[in-house]
Structure formats: C-alpha cells, structure tokens
C-alpha cells in the first residue's frame, strides 16, 4: 500500500490533517505543542483508491526530554513513506523549526515531497503573502485548512495522482486485529517494538510516554496482524490534564476497533486495583482477552511461582475466567511466540460452528441431569437452542419464560456448552427468549454474558 507521512514542526496542524484525511479522531489534537510523540498510522480512501497515512511528532531545534526519540520516529516515518507531506502553518508563520525540518527533508532526494501550507482559514488565496515560504526551497505550497476542510480534496487528488508511480502492492488479509492495554509502564510499547522488530514507539522509564493509540501492521510467520498500542490508563485521580483524558478515550476507542485484547500486567509487582479496573474494560467489551504477564524475567521463581501468580490473577479477575494467561518478557524477547500461539487457538474457537441438533442434544442432556431451580414462582423449561451469528459464540435458548431463569443455572449451561464444544478461551453469550408471543410481550429477554446476566 502507498505510504504517506506528515512531517513538520509542532503545532502546524499535522494531527488535525491526519484526522481529517482518515475521517476519524484518532490522533490527539490540542493547542499544546508536541502532543504527538509516536508515529500514528491510518488508512485513507479517495476515489476508490487507498493509501496509508502516517502522523508524526513535531521537529524542533529546542531541547526536550523526548525530542531525540521523536526525531528518530520521524526519521522512521520518512524512510518507510513513499510521499512526504511537509506541513507549515500560515497562522504562525515560519521560524527556525520550519527551516530545520526543511533541511532534514532535503537529505531525502529520492522522496516525493508535497509542500502544504495549513491554517488558511478565510483569507483570499490571491491576497496571501507567500514569499517567505519560498525560502524553504520546496516551491509554491498547496493551500489548505485541515480544520475547515479547505483544499483537502485537491490534496487528495495530488496524492492519488502520484500513486501509480509507486506501483500497486497486493494487500494481504489480516489474521487478527488486537489492542494492547494496561496501566502505564507495564511494557506495552516494549512489546509493540518487539512485535515490529524496531523502535516504532517511544520507550522510557517515565510512565505515560505513549499518549496516542498507535496502529501498526506487521507480519509474523508470513501472516499479517494489526496491533493497536494504547496509552496507559492511570487512576482517575491522576487524570489531571486534557491530554491524559484524551488518552483514556483513545484507549476505549482502540478497544472498540479491535477484535481481541491483550491485557498486560507487570509480573514484577503485586496486582493493583488499577489493574482490576482496566480488566473491567475487557469484560465490558465482551472481546476475547489474553492476560499477558510481562517482566517475568525480573521475578525470583521456583516451580510454584507461576501457578501462585495465576491463582492471584484468577482471584482478582473473576469476571474473566475464560481468559488464557501467558508469561513473557517483552524487553528480553522471551516467550513472545506464545502470544501468537494463543491468538491462533482463540481464532479457531471463534470459528466453531455447531449444528443445531448437536447443540440441542447437549443442552437437553444438561437440562435433564440438572433441573433448573424454582425461581420467581416457577421452573425454567428450555425447548430449543440454536447458535446465532456474532463476533463471539452466541446462543439463543427458547424457553417457557426468561423470568424464571436464575443466573446460577445460566452459568451451569454456559459451562456445559464450553466443555462440550471446546470453547475454553473465548467469551460466549446466551440469550434466553420466550418461545411464545404472549410471554414475549409480558417478559424481557435475558442476556447472560460470562459471569453475570443483564436484562435486555
């Protein structure tokens, strides 16, 4: 796929342009310079043609604790991109940072560079004073306002017009899309860099280095995956700034865009209430979740350590009893392959389709062996069960009246279905519906999800 990188100094509107092009608010946008630190990837479609857009951190001559790493990330983006959008701001004018970015880009004579002048709001284009911008050495800029969508169509036409120069690369089908979530500094970015085999994300001992949710595609054993790394979720009392609040929202959005979750824990410290809260997001999302215990190389171990830690996890995450638990060290590159082995196991279980006759045999047998308790004045009677379409295994059980269902019996049936059909690593959902129209009007269907049930 054609790759286009957005490059420029801080606060020229790179992230606003990125969000405008992908028609979604993924990159954090704020008036504070330097908000974007990592590369952020998104897909753009224009006139039935697609390309990948890369947002980058701002280039500046000023010293910053992260500036050297940010510049490294920008360099990675330039290296992998086919086209560079060099963005300047008409509102702020040019300064030493613009010249610094221009000097860096001029070193890449093999790259196609489109000079873009942003933040042209309501000015008449014919009255613009562009003389100072010619000093950057890239000719006349394309005039846009990313915030107000002015000139965006012309910019997209220019990019698509260059697409044929770079050939058409066949797009490989994704095996899985998953996000990595966890509290700050558990090693999410270190794992992502291990998966990608390069320093794609800033890694630091300072908690909260990653602010955006960062999409990346990579190949493992010749199969294509998409991973979404996220900012660490802090305790509510520590979400002090707008930027941190945006990061929490990005994490929630990353989960909504994923098909699977890697919940990362720090194995070198005790589990915290914060870990439990983040685990609750996995439960609410109702997505397959792999609990990944990181930094296992730092733990003093004997033959019982792993099992004891698993028991602690099961005690803290009672609402995720089906989630597999694996132990890795992202920094030391230990047992990373177990992530993909587990993903493949989960994918296989998600694809299981059960014949209606076999499913009814299992449910009716379970029903006969263990009769439902009397609840709300009567006993539940199940007459028919079928598998419904869904992202996770979903089953509809027709009964005399869902009001007679006790949650313990729903859990019993869930466990029987899991045992019979090998659904040990995925969430499943049971819908209890009345078999006749009259009861359907008088009662509510019951949705049983994992370890509890909600009235629909």
Curated annotation (Swiss-Prot):
Q: Is Kinase set as a keyword in this record?
A: no
Q: Which organism is it from?
A: Mycoplasmoides gallisepticum (strain R(low / passage 15 / clone 2))
GO BP terms in the entry: ribosome biogenesis
Does this entry carry the keyword Ubl conjugation? no
Q: State the PROSITE patterns in the record.
A: G_ENGA
Provide the EngA-type G domain boundaries: 2-167, 176-351
| Protein name in UniProt | GTPase Der
Q: What does this protein do?
A: GTPase that plays an essential role in the late steps of ribosome biogenesis.
Q: Which GO terms describe its molecular function?
A: GTP binding; ribosome binding
Q: Which CDD domains match?
A: EngA1, EngA2
For binding GTP 1, which residues are annotated in this chain's numbering?
Answer: 8-15, 55-59, 118-121
Q: Where does GTP 2 bind?
A: 182-189, 229-233, 294-297
This protein's source sits in the domain of life called Bacteria
Q: How does it assemble?
A: Associates with the 50S ribosomal subunit.
Keyword annotations for this protein, in alphabetical order, are: GTP-binding, Nucleotide-binding, Repeat, Ribosome biogenesis
